[in-house]
Amino acid sequence: AGRKVRVFKHGPDYLDPMVLEVASGQPVYQLHPWMTGEDECRWRLMEAAQDADLILVEGSMGLFDGDPSSADLAKLMGIPALPVIDARGMAQTFGAVALGLSKFDSALPVYQVIANRIGSPRHGAMLRESLPEGISLLGAIPRNEAMSLPNRHLGQIFYLITQTFSYHPNLQYL
């Protein structure tokens, strides 16, 4: 509690930054090397770092999808990736997916992951146990159909998502 968080969004998205701005209480800018240029991306991050305790950049699509991808931006800016992995219906495969993401591009560090849509505390423990050495589980978000994100009406479930997130991933370890 009490941390000043600055949030950015990768990609040409206009709805997500508005939602993220409400959540963070700070302006949210897009970081996209092709749209805004590398210098603009660096300047925005450096400016935010002057007074922020934590900077989060929400990616777009899959980590390695798009041109430039979220991974490309992270490498360009020297930011480690924190993948959120849909864990529904997985146990040991969760560890394989995390390992694959960490090894796919050796220039992109992946130290932690977040499990999304877990079924129970035991499921979360199984996911944690499946992770290879060097990758830890930062948090596990329970499955809750009320928090699913349909393409429309995203703002209607924002409160529920923020309440649930506040009880699960432990941001003090970031």
Spans of model-derived segments:
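ATP-dependent carboxylate-amine ligase catalytic core
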Residues: 1-77, 85-108, 121-125
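Short glycine-rich or small-residue beta-strand-to-loop segments that form or flank ligand, phosphate
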Residues: 82-85, 114
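Internal gly/pro-rich beta-alpha loop/helix module
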Residues: 91-174
